[in-house]
A protein has these predicted regions:
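Amphipathic alpha-helical packing elements
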Residues: 15-16, 205-206, 214-226, 231, ...
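Single conserved hydrophobic/aromatic residue that forms the stacking wall/gate
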Residues: 1-7
Length: 383
């Protein structure tokens, strides 16, 4: 039994109970912090674009200097700094601005639930000040929304498009990481596919009319690692407001992503559908801060971003970096060329509502209503 009994929340492992959904989310967060604080805090850092707040060394300095000035190989510079690859993408996707502009669209019911989860993390931190990284608290609903907004494209292989984008900037198109959607007549892909053995998550459902014991069966065989930030954390969450869900979630996520309630269940798999496009932009030869759009020269939208590098103790250095956006999406550019990336879900922030609706669904129509929000476009779902 956990000690997270506060008011109406109670944890009796592996279950969390609360009078309201928000109460249950509070207890859920507290229990998850007890069990996997390391990865919960990692998710908070990622949700703020701060994974690269690391120890300073000469290699770090050289890599960040190259990123800021645009010199050297971009991928090599990113690889030199632990966590900075994800921080770079977080800032490249301009997650903060997207969330700032759209968080008001999230229903109050969803925000209250997420706040309950954040409050649970903060309560754990208050009770265990010597165990936590106090610089991360208080965690907020904003953090959690930003984290889910950022993570969703990562599930469908947006890294392949990023690799292609970077290689185009480096004039090394054939160095692109393998993309499962690339034409099979591409000699590089054909060579790799000779050795590639298909693998991945799977799920299937069997109707009671087709089972020998007249029972409905759902098999969820998602291929996740046994440890780490995307290992499943299993939980049963029940509230007096209709939440009664059991299944798997990730550290730092307030919702069950695969599982069942008393009415229905689902599994999910992830593959690499074609959900992104790269645009080559025509630069104004007289002003490379402009690109052509509908026959006219328009300015790139510029945002000032920062990478924070830890020195020692409470001291750190902040390095500025400028990011560019076009009407098509985020841009990588130099004096001679520019490429923009557009991807599914680029401006979506309401994933939380879709997950909460699925968690509380009473029938297939309610469950499908959650999917019709089109916030989880990259997932294959088995009901």
């Amino acid at each position: 039994i956990s000690d997270c009994l506060v008011g109406s929340e109670m944890c009796i492992r592996d279950s969390v109970y609360g009078d309201t959904d928000k109460d249950a989310a509070f207890g859920f967060a507290y229990a998850q912090a007890e069990d996997d604080l390391k990865h919960v805090e990692m998710m908070i850092k990622m949700s703020r674009g701060e994974l690269s707040n690391l120890n300073f060394n000469s290699k770090t300095f050289a890599a960040i200097y190259s990123l800021i000035t645009g010199s050297g190989d971009i991928m090599e510079n990113l690889d030199a700094i632990e966590g900075v690859e994800l921080d770079f993408l977080f800032k490249f996707f301009n997650v903060h601005e997207t969330v700032n502009n759209k968080i008001s669209e999230i229903p109050e019911e969803t925000i209250n639930y997420i706040k309950g989860y954040a409050d649970g993390l903060n309560y754990y931190a208050a009770k265990n000040p010597n165990l936590v990284d106090q610089s991360l608290y208080p965690a907020t609903a904003y953090d959690l929304v930003a984290g889910m907004t950022f993570r969703m494209p990562l599930f469908y292989g947006i890294d392949h498009s990023i690799a292609e984008l970077i290689n185009l900037m480096d004039d090394q198109e054939e160095k692109v990481a393998m993309n499962m959607n690339a034409p099979s007549d591409n000699p590089i892909v054909a060579s790799i596919n000779t050795y590639f053995k298909p693998s991945g998550s799977n799920a299937f459902a069997v109707s009671k009319s087709r089972s020998q014991d007249n029972e409905t069966m759902l098999v969820i065989n998602s291929h996740q690692p046994l440890t780490g930030p995307v290992a499943w954390y299993e939980i049963h969450i029940k509230s007096g407001e209709g939440l009664n869900i059991m299944g798997g979630t990730f550290p730092g996520s307030p919702f069950v992503h695969v599982g069942f309630n008393e009415n229905l269940g689902w599994g999910a798999t992830v593959n690499q559908p074609d959900l992104s496009d790269i645009y080559e932009l025509k630069l104004n030869p007289e002003n490379n801060d402009q690109y052509e759009l509908d026959g006219a020269w328009v300015n790139f939208t510029e945002t000032d971003q920062e990478f924070k590098v830890k020195l020692f103790g409470p001291f750190s250095i902040t390095y500025p970096i400028q990011m560019y956006h076009s009407a098509h999406g985020p841009v990588l550019k130099d004096d001679n060329k520019a490429y923009a990336l557009r991807f599914v879900g680029m401006n979506d922030v309401n994933h939380s509502t879709a997950w909460l609706k699925m968690n509380k669904s009473k029938n297939i129509d309610e469950w499908l209503d959650a999917l019709r929000m089109e916030q989880l476009a990259s997932l294959n779902l088995v009901y």
